[in-house]
């Protein structure tokens, strides 16, 4: 590749003109998985250089309206107290049940419900054992792999993007 290059951490505020160009993206970490779908429609050709497949999940973040923000501010003391008592200091509490103690249908329903929520609920409000090595983690990992396969239409490419060498949560999930 020749021409301009840029690290995503130093992306120009005015952007880069990539229309009609051959573009290479090195890596499939957090920045890359946000960048790739944004530039893919405008470039002539996109090559992604991936060493290791990563789990990827949408955060579904969005703007917070003024009423909600005021509610948050009014409840700062309670929010900070709760965050001091939870994993990762987030406003989420693990479901005290084991994923393997409920039916496969109930697990899937919870996984899907949490997948649709914003923020880290899909990790930190899930069954207590999905973030630990073992059967529950593998079950949830397969759910996330399925989401990757759903999103990537080419099955050959999808399999290249599905992590097979580490448990879910062992690496930061972009």
Predicted regions and their residues:
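Glycine-rich dinucleotide-binding loop and its adjacent helix/turn
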Residues: 1-42
């Amino acid at each position: 590749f020749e021409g301009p290059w840029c690290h995503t951490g130093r992306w120009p505020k005015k952007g880069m003109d990539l229309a009609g160009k051959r573009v290479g993206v090195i890596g499939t970490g957090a920045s890359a998985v946000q960048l790739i779908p944004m530039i893919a429609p405008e470039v002539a050709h996109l090559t992604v250089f991936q060493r290791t497949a990563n789990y990827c999940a949408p955060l579904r973040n969005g703007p917070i309206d003024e009423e909600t923000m005021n509610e948050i501010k009014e409840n700062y003391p309670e929010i900070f107290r709760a965050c001091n008592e939870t994993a990762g200091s987030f406003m989420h509490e693990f479901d005290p049940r084991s994923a393997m103690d409920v039916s496969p249908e109930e697990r899937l329903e919870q996984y899907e419900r949490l997948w649709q929520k914003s923020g880290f609920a899909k990790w930190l409000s899930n069954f207590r054992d999905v973030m630990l090595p073992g059967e529950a983690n593998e079950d949830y990992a397969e759910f996330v792999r399925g989401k990757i396969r759903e999103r990537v239409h080419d099955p050959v490419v999808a399999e290249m993007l599905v992590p097979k060498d580490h448990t879910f949560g062992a690496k930061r999930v972009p």
